[in-house]
């Protein structure tokens, strides 16, 4: 039963780096895509910046690809990711308990991810946390709604939610920017893939270095 006093009855979670650690699946799939294009990158750590931002833009910015070449890379990435990379992932310790507690308090939960929705829903199903969420919103395979600002606006409109009743939680600047540009409060979490400097520079409503701090902040909202 919803607590009428909840400050933010609706909570939007990013997926990669916030609910799960997708490091292996994403970096190995990027490595695979690059190899298909004749680029050898043996160091997976050098590919971790692909976790979070829109994939197409990340290929363009990192390797100087034009859009057509970047789409080639994205399609090669998906060849591996949809079969193997989806499952090279793990739910962060403490997340299932946090989601259970939030739902128990009456919050309605959503996923808002730049990852294609078809992949996000399969990850949530496979790792058995989909039951906690009213809906899982992601981008389309054609690149529509890969930007967080557009995605969050679409979620708010589709669900009929007032921005002031929503809270976005994410680990990268894109999450914070997307939220703030829609008038949504946001929490930056430091246990994912964005640095504290990156997150604080975008002035989140709260910064939580770890899951314990996140839980403490959420208990007050």
Curated annotation (Swiss-Prot):
Record-annotated active site: 14
Entry EC no(s): 3.1.3.5
Organism: Pseudomonas aeruginosa (strain ATCC 15692 / DSM 22644 / CIP 104116 / JCM 14847 / LMG 12228 / 1C / PRS 101 / PAO1)
Any single GO CC term annotated in Swiss-Prot or TrEMBL for this entry: cytosol
Protein name, as recorded: 5'-nucleotidase
PANTHER family to which the protein is assigned, alphabetical: 5'-NUCLEOTIDASE, PHOSPHOGLYCOLATE PHOSPHATASE
Keywords carried by this UniProt record: Hydrolase, Magnesium, Manganese, Metal-binding, Nucleotide-binding
Role description: Specifically dephosphorylates nucleoside 5'-monophosphates to nucleosides and inorganic phosphate. Displays high activity toward 5'-UMP and 5'-IMP, significant activity against 5'-XMP and 5'-TMP, and low activity against 5'-CMP.
Comment on pH dependence: Optimum pH is 7.4.
GO molecular function, one term: 5'-nucleotidase activity
Disulphide connectivity of cysteines: none
Cofactor(s) of this protein: Mn(2+); Mg(2+)
Cofactor: binding comment: Divalent metal cation. Prefers Mn(2+) over Mg(2+).
InterPro entries: HAD-like_hydrolase_sf, HAD-like_sf, HAD_2, HAD_sf, PGP-like_dom2
Transmembrane segments: none
């Amino acid at each position: 039963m919803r607590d009428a006093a909840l400050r933010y009855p609706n909570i939007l979670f990013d997926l990669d780096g916030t609910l799960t650690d997708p490091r292996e699946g994403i970096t190995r799939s990027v490595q695979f895509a690059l190899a298909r294009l004749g680029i050898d990158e043996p160091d997976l750590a050098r590919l971790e910046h692909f976790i979070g931002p829109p994939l197409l833009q990340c290929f363009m910015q990192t390797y100087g690809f034009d859009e057509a070449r970047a789409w080639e890379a994205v399609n090669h990435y998906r060849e591996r990711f949809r079969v193997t990379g989806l499952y090279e992932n793990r739910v962060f310790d403490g997340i299932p308990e946090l989601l259970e507690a939030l739902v128990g308090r009456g919050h309605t939960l959503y996923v808002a991810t730049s990852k294609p929705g078809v992949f996000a829903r399969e990850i949530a199903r496979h790792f058995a946390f989909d039951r906690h969420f009213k809906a899982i919103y992601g981008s389309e395979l054609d690149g529509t709604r890969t930007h967080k600002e557009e995605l969050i606006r679409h979620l708010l409109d589709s669900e009929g939610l007032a921005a002031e009743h929503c809270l976005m939680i994410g680990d990268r600047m894109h999450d914070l920017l997307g939220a703030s540009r829609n008038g949504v409060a946001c929490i930056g979490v430091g246990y994912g893939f964005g640095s504290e400097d990156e997150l604080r520079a975008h002035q989140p409503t709260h910064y939580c270095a770890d899951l314990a701090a996140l839980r403490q902040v959420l208990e007050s909202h």
